[in-house]
Amino acid sequence: MSVIKMTDLDLAGKRVLIRADLNVPVKEGKVTSDARIRASLPTIEAALKQGAKVMVTSHLGRPTEGEYNEEFSLLPVVNYLKEKLSSPVRLAKDYLDGVEIAAGELVVLENVRFNKGEKKDDEALSKKYAALCDVYVMDAFGTAHRAQASTHGVGKFAPIACAGPLLSAELEALGKALGNPARPMVAIVGGSKVSTKLTVLGALSKIADKLIVGGGIANTFVAAQGHNVGKSLYEADLIPEAKRLLETCDIPVPTDVRVATEFSETAAATLKPANEIKDDEQILDLGDESAERLAEILKNAKTILWNGPVGVFEFPNFRKGTEIVARAIAESEAFSIAGGGDTLAAIDLFGIADQISYISTGGGAFLEFVEGKKLPAVVMLEERAKQ
């Protein structure tokens, strides 16, 4: 995967436009979770340090395209950056016809989704973005799977288009886990539905030595073995697909589970064998025996790809399976990469972030990469590197 890297360029005096992922939750004008901004800070600081004229932009939320809406303004992000950076920081609302900017200054360009044509990758808008800069830096892996004007179109017309440090690290980590992984390679796919992760399961079944399934996905596999799953969330129409995967890949299906008679935080958990589930019960977590078996597999792994919890970890009574698996990943000497919103929430809950080799910032982009799909932004950067 050969792309031009921002770290290889001399940015002194250049107008640099960074497309970051600053799509953070905001409440009453304040940023409530700063993880994505924190991840982008080293890229911004590196460009400023070189004496570049730095512009950074992002989307935030889902405003009506082409209309300004204060609720989705990047102003709270600007206020946050002012506290963290020693350089001057300001917000530019009307910037499509040009921005006056000094070396060592940071200008945040207002929410790209306020511009008509952003989502449709409009060529005229892409050219306006491109005219603002000498160097375009794509650093938002989380939106690399969408061909939009600020993530894709602009890169086709900017004098130079390169990958930022975050995007480069993300592609390297995914390449290491999927391209030529150290073996045994173990993949974990959790989540509620097989249907939404079908292509991911299919792709990983060809790469992984063992494929661990969790959550509602695992219930479909339990059902595929002929067991009653009661009121559990599962997909009867995908049982043939589950059976096919069981034949082609090593999938350790749970042998014991935690069940409840209702889906609620206060529901009592009952531990039982997977072949003894009653009609009024639903599986909400792995049993201890199954979780410990997975922990053993993970401890011996050399590469781990983790996407999704193995139970309803948001409910304390059904957290144990995910915790055992999470701690086994943290303690394993394997190269581990984790991605997806629920997975990141579990990592935070158990406080193991510094024990995971690489935590992916992209949800949909992470999954599409795992599926083997080409990400439009990455394809564009590869094409520009050839020119």
Curated annotation (Swiss-Prot):
Q: What is its main location?
A: cytoplasm
> Single GO molecular-function term?
ATP binding
Catalysed conversion reaction: (2R)-3-phosphoglycerate + ATP = (2R)-3-phospho-glyceroyl phosphate + ADP
Q: Which residues cross the membrane?
A: none
- EC number(s) per entry: 2.7.2.3
For this UniProt record, give its keywords in alphabetical order, as a comma-separated list.
Answer: ATP-binding, Cytoplasm, Glycolysis, Kinase, Nucleotide-binding, Transferase
Coiled-coil regions listed in the entry = none
- Top-level EC class: transferase
Return the InterPro entries for the record: Phosphoglycerate_kinase (IPR001576), Phosphoglycerate_kinase_CS (IPR015911), Phosphoglycerate_kinase_N (IPR015824), Phosphoglycerate_kinase_sf (IPR036043)
Cellular compartments annotated: Cytoplasm
GO BP terms: namely: gluconeogenesis; glycolytic process
UniProt pathway annotation = Carbohydrate degradation; glycolysis; pyruvate from D-glyceraldehyde 3-phosphate: step 2/5
GO CC annotation: what is one? cytosol
Q: Quick one: which residues bind substrate?
A: 21-23, 36, 59-62, 113, 146
Q: Where does ATP bind?
A: 197, 314, 340-343
Q: How does it assemble?
A: Monomer.
* Family (UniProt): Belongs to the phosphoglycerate kinase family.
- What this protein is called in its record is Phosphoglycerate kinase
Native species? Yersinia pestis
